[in-house]
């Protein structure tokens, strides 16, 4: 009798497995939809609109040709020195932002778009090349090309752009944005504000803008 019960359970398990395999596409779509429903509903955003993600208020300052939204922290999230050099790739700020990446992913899933950060120096040198981040800080070019859409704050904040590089005037100075919106440079071990940004993927197709 006990053996018959075991055989009956195994048969039910086999039947269940067969049903799952027969409907695996439906199951995959169901699981995907269930996961997506756990993520934050993000409304359509215009330039200047804000949304709170990972307990930070983000303001849209740019939209690219694919309709992706560039979201900049509306205020300072931390204060830190830039590191031991002006190379963003080795900055402790960059490493700290990896924690923020995970918090953002928990709320919006795969809607965060990789950022190619161009570390072309202010004096025209490319020693540092580029790097890829999911959350980063603005470069000089990204700031100046969108300055009119970027809210000024009371603190000066770091840019990822070096003032020069080892093949030029050295690796000591980093560009920053002052509280008046002007751009200057500071020694890498100064304590400056960190104002990160990320790119929010468009899920509605290519923008008509």
Where in the sequence are the language-model features?
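Short, Lys/Arg-enriched N-terminal segments with co-localized hydrophobic residues
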Residues: 1-6
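Collagenous Gly-X-Y triple-helix signature in extracellular proteins
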Residues: 8-209
